[in-house]
Amino acid sequence: SRDTLGNIQDMTFEQAWNGERQQKLREDLLSGVRNEFCYQCWDLEDQGSVSMRQAHNISRKHMIPKNCSKIMPFQVPVLELKMSNLCNFRCRTCKPDLSTTWLKDWDKVKHEYESIGVINEIEKQTKFNNDQFIEDIVKLAPTMQIVEFAGGEPLMDPLHYKVLEALEPFGDKISVKYSTNLSKVKFGKFDTIASWSKFKGVDISLSIDGYPALNDYIRTEADTDVLAQNLREVKSALGNKYKGRAALCYSAWNVMGLPESYDYFEHVLDTPVHGNIAWDPIFINPQVLPKELKQLATAKYKKYLNTVEATNERNKRIHRFINQNMNFLNAKDESKHFEQFLRYTKTLDESRSTSFVAVVPEFKDYV
């Protein structure tokens, strides 16, 4: 696919590390060529926003070898693992290849994806649960500094706990990082917080898409109050080992509620803001909103920023991500897909007994 460098179902980690596509990517980046795999970062940078590429080039500068070439030693300081699509939520910005729970009403909306040429896998994906996978990770462990877990929902994936157990002997030198809905901190016999305490640090990107009513609407099956309680437990148990942020996925559903969401993250969750963008499918992209709603949101964002003094790092992050989202919102006119967004939203509301307008009344004249 457009952003796949290798598949460890067909090769080992080590083979993928210096595979043909990986070599070409390194060669392009070292030569200043914009490789197509990195299109999201290039697009954000062209809009004047700070991309993940730019941010990591600063925060992880100490991990970059002095001598880089297209073939590199098999030493991986940062490893991100997406091992399955097991998940207990049906987030509107998601789909079955990333959430098994989405299968409940997928048949009602899959034609919307197919209409834009997107076909999704709809099977439970647990193909990496084998001895070779664990052996490869243990082989890498001595040079690892950060292991990142995503999903699916990693905290309900048994393989995730298997990996944690394998890494525990190296835990004093490894930090673990998560993209998680934090709906569970215990899973079967596994005590997540107890395991985390054996590692150097724990970095959590909370998957949360708004203040409680908005988050619970977008992320079907979510209970934001449970998330807040679990977050308090994690912070209390881990102390200085913990760091985290609220990683809102900016979509057409939460454009209007962004200021209230950031206010909740800052003052209730006591957590710095972060952000991702729902680039696709195109019909949930924030850019599908009509001009009038974009103007309303833009005015709301500017008014909110006037109340947030950029005098500390957390407030500076609010300014950064509000401006990034505002720039993205207004960068393109994709309003030709707005009717599809409304239709898709209506179908899910009927299937899930929810009401978008009840949560975001600014859309009442459009539905």
Question: What is the role of each PLM region?
Answer:
Residues 2-43:
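Membrane-interface junctions of multi-pass transporters
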Residues 34-46, 86-96:
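Local cysteine-cluster metal-coordination motifs and their immediate loop/turn environment
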Residues 46-77, 87-89, 128:
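Recognition helices and adjacent regulatory flanks at domain boundaries
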Residues 76-86, 97-129, 142-158, 170-188, ...:
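Core AdoMet radical
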Residues 116-131, 140, 145-147, 169, ...:
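Eukaryote-biased activation of long, low-complexity terminal tails and linkers
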Residues 134-140, 164-169, 193-197:
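Leucine-rich repeat
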Residues 159-165, 187-195, 257-261:
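Distinct, well-ordered alpha-helical segments
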Residues 175-177, 198-205, 224-366:
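Conserved C-terminal portion of the radical SAM core fold
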